[in-house]
């Protein structure tokens, strides 16, 4: 990722010019906001000090997204809603993205990742029932992709993440059965052959998930 930093910075600078030239274009705004987030991925906020992380373009991205997120066009735009959830999930105020998440979760019904994504906010706000329910929905949607394209691909990492969140939500609800069921299904969805792939190094991404069944049994 570090090797791509200069490319990310150059792209964000180019998108800034495009956005300034076309400030009302929601597609340009979406790509510009994403470009800002990609400059410091998962480092938009200092979670220990409850403030914007030093050197991050958090405020810029927030201004762009909040300009559109509650407009008629923005309320039905998967890109704007998705990025706003990503931006706010580690913020001191994740609840600000609850409405965006609610709009996103049924907007693209065959995209399991977008069904899942609002549960990042649900989990931060204690909405564990929604976290379990909507990840089960995301799992079902993504199984159609697995049946069509197989499991020997990087998207399996996204699908496994749905099981991960279903387990998390179920454990916080004190519900053993859905938690252990999700853990066992998740293991079945990770072929040994996939873990053996070296490029990309899929074991680095996926192997730790297999231990979650033990986590459920202990908790």
Place the predicted regions along the sequence by residue.
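Alpha-helix capping and inter-helical loop/turn segments
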Residues: 41, 92-95, 218-219
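Flexible glycine/proline-rich, aromatic-decorated loop/lid segments
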Residues: 129-146
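Alpha-helical positions within canonical tetratricopeptide repeat
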Residues: 10, 27, 60, 96-99, ...
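Structural helix-adjacent loops and short alpha-helical linkers that scaffold large soluble proteins
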Residues: 4, 73-74, 93-95, 127-130, ...
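Hydrophobic/aromatic side-chain positions at a characteristic register within alpha-helices
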Residues: 89, 123, 171, 215-218
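Short coil/linker segments at helix-helix boundaries
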Residues: 1-24, 31-75, 81-91, 100-103, ...
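Extended catalytic-interface subdomain
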Residues: 135-138, 156-190, 207-210, 214
């Amino acid at each position: 990722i570090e090797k791509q930093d200069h490319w990310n910075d150059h792209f964000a600078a180019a998108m800034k010019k495009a956005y300034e030239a076309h400030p009302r274009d929601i597609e340009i705004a979406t790509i510009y906001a994403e470009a800002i987030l990609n400059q410091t991925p998962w480092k938009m906020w200092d979670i220990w000090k409850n403030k914007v992380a030093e050197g991050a373009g958090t405020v810029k991205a927030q201004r762009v997204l909040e300009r559109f997120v509650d407009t008629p066009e923005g309320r039905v735009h998967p890109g704007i809603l998705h990025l706003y959830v990503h931006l706010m999930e580690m913020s001191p105020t994740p609840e600000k993205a609850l409405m965006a998440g609610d709009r996103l979760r049924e907007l693209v019904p065959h995209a399991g990742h977008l069904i899942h994504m609002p549960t990042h906010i649900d989990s931060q706000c204690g909405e564990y029932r929604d976290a379990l329910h909507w990840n089960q929905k995301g799992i079902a949607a993504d199984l159609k992709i697995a049946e069509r394209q197989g499991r020997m691909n990087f998207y399996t990492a996204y699908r496994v993440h749905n099981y991960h969140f279903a387990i998390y939500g179920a454990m916080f609800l004190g519900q053993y059965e859905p938690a252990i069921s999700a853990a066992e299904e998740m293991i079945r969805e990770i072929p040994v052959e996939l873990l053996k792939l070296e490029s990309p190094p899929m074991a680095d991404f996926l192997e730790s998930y297999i231990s979650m069944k033990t986590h459920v049994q202990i908790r």
